[in-house]
């Protein structure tokens, strides 16, 4: 019993660190420089720009139905940890919007913002994955599809799902500009 409780404490501490790093990458580098990553985070950034609520709020709202579906189709422990991580990402992202300045890449350093933002998000995701958690969103869909089609690599599934989101982000962006 003690070992299990200790493991959960370590897992939660690492999930806190993972969510903080991920959120800072989104807030500090990605969102202010109009870089829309794939998945729920990318959709959330676009919604925040259009409707004005915090990016973290949209991350939570879009993840609620996915988490519910995940509870029916995936490992319960993974989904509990994912739910905790999504709430942490929501809180940290919205707090960062209030208190943390952003990296302005308007001087031509958009590539730097994309690299550092992507790296921070990747480190956060990796830390979470290492503890049987996800950031929610398309990660949940990837795990569900991967379970139904074990012959497909999870990275491939994730790339396809994020590619679909990115293509829709571009289409919506073009329609909004015209």
Name each model feature, range by range:
Residues 34-44, 97-107, 139:
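Membrane-interface helix termini and inter-helical loops of multi-pass transporters
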Residues 42-49, 139-150:
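Short amphipathic alpha-helical coupling elements at transmembrane boundaries
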Residues 44, 62-69, 160-169:
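Hydrophobic, membrane-inserted alpha-helices
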Residues 47-61, 110-115:
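Structural signature of hydrophobic alpha-helical transmembrane segments
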Residues 87-95, 99, 110-132, 153-155:
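Mid-bilayer segments of alpha-helical transmembrane spans in multi-pass integral membrane proteins
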Residues 170-176:
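Conserved small/polar residues in nucleotide/adenosyl-binding loops
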């Amino acid at each position: 019993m003690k070992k299990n409780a200790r493991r959960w404490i370590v897992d939660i501490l690492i999930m806190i660190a993972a969510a903080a790093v991920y959120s800072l990458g989104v807030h500090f580098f990605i969102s202010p420089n109009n870089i829309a990553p794939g998945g729920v985070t990318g959709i959330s950034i676009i919604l925040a720009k259009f409707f004005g609520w915090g990016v973290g709020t949209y991350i939570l709202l879009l993840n609620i139905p996915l988490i519910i579906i995940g509870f029916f189709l995936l490992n319960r422990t993974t989904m509990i940890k994912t739910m905790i991580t999504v709430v942490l990402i929501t809180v940290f992202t919205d707090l960062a919007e209030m208190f943390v300045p952003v990296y302005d890449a308007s001087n031509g350093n958009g590539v730097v913002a994309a690299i550092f933002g992507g790296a921070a998000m990747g480190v956060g995701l990796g830390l979470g994955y290492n503890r049987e958690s996800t950031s929610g969103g398309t990660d949940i869909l990837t795990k569900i599809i991967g379970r139904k089609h074990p012959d497909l690599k999870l990275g491939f599934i994730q790339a396809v799902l994020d590619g679909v989101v990115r293509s829709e982000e571009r289409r919506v962006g073009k329609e909004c500009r015209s």
